[in-house]
Amino acid sequence: MQLSVWTYEGPPHIGAMRIATAMRDVHYVLHAPQGDTYADLLFTMIERRDRRPPVTYTTFQARDLGGDTADLLQSAARAAYERFQPQAMLVGASCTAELIQDDPGGLAQALRLPIPVIPLELPAYQRKENWGASETFYRIVRALAASSADGSPRHERKAGARPVCNLLGPTALGFRHRDDLAEVTRQVVELGIEINVVAPWNATPADLARLPQADFNIVLYPEIALTAAQWLNRQFGQPYTKTIPIGVGATRDFIREVAGLAGVDAEPVLSRAESRLPWYSRSVDSTYLTGKRVFIFGDATHAVAAARVATQELGFEVVGLGTYAREFAREIREAAALYGIEPLITDDYLQVEARVSELRPELVLGTQMERHIAKRLGIPCAVISSPTHVQDFPARYSPQMGFEGANVLFDTWVHPLMMGLEEHLLGMFREDHEFADHAPSHLGAAPAAPPQQPQLRVVETVTSTELAWASDAERELTKIPFFVRGKARRNTERFARERNVNLITLETLYDAKAHFGR
């Protein structure tokens, strides 16, 4: 066990809650102590949902452990059915209740309720949130889809009938899942494909029973839906997509893949496709972004997609790539090999911070924790993956997928760099007479009183390696853009050490610049 102030994923029962909360007419009975009810706040406070998750907690206390906690669970399950009248019930235990070993699923099934009761066995001390969501969705699909079909391969589509697909993966508390779903739905409809079921988002148990009626499945988030899609493929012969439409290039590949599975022509849709990212990334005001060093960390789906967009569409250089999801370590390693870098597979945020400090990138793309890390290190950052905070569940339309999602990516990733450059330019020209506080105002007001000039610092700064910076060299260093200032300082100090120069003057700084600029 590791004590930490931050975790990238919660226990697996949080993943189960994400599935139950995303669906309709489903109720989750969770065998848990009173302290585990904190999870409701993830949905009401962070995601800002207008209703509580459909979860009933047994909320046993310490004094109950000497009695029959199994009876508590059965009473809670019976009361939940009578009050909420769900079409299906999920039953499981939290990480704390798992230690009691009460077998919640078996106890609930013994009640003989007139609805499907789906037991969830989620090992809290071996697995985490995304796996819990994937396993829960798989168990629900297997229980409900299998009960409505004889297991035979799907029937071939009649001539002239529109192709039909399912959209799998969007959940509650997912990073931009609501808007991604709207964007992908629009693209699928433009291809002339009918959508049979979207799951788990807003799906009912009756909807999941109709999953076998589709011709193929679109997997939007492999962390959630891949296991279920693989089972549907084996059981009903439904193929599934493997391309994630994040970025212009990936979206075009996705449209071609979907069109191939549906047997339709993708070119009319591709010819009408519009995204401002390709032109913006080539435009004059963006050329200074070329070659910027970027560090990427998040869930595997978003991290791998972000690396492709960064290198192929924005001209960045990926210097770090990693994930906290060990189940998808293979995908991250394969992607890292393409960029010739060492992957970082860890759920320890301290290791991530150490890697960022070591690489000193010019942009960090990550989760909420990487936002904190980058802020401490003074590096621009954009959030690309869960876990996130409340500001990453915006009221506005802000997808990550599709052509509109590519526009959002450009704004989200590039604006931190552009605003940083703007601040640098203001600082660089602050001493010019045009920007002086006592200059005449165009508003006709009296000029401001001349400000007190601070005394120039003449004391030389000494680093831990006994290198001294002259005050004029230090001032000149501040005129270098912030996103390369650290590199300029390191190169200059390295240049000075190699030549046994103890005092870095303005001339030393210029000599170092000329040396490394060759």
UniProtKB/Swiss-Prot annotation:
Matches recorded under InterPro entries: ChlB/BchB/BchZ, LI-POR_suB-like_C, Nase/OxRdtase_comp1, P-CP_red_C, Protochl_reductB, Protochlorophyllide_Rdtase
GO terms (BP aspect): light-independent bacteriochlorophyll biosynthetic process; photosynthesis, dark reaction
Domain of life: Bacteria
Disulfide bonds: none
Main function: Component of the dark-operative protochlorophyllide reductase (DPOR) that uses Mg-ATP and reduced ferredoxin to reduce ring D of protochlorophyllide (Pchlide) to form chlorophyllide a (Chlide). This reaction is light-independent. The NB-protein (BchN-BchB) is the catalytic component of the complex.
Subunit: Protochlorophyllide reductase is composed of three subunits; BchL, BchN and BchB. Forms a heterotetramer of two BchB and two BchN subunits.
Protein name per UniProt: Light-independent protochlorophyllide reductase subunit B
Organism: Bradyrhizobium sp. (strain ORS 278)
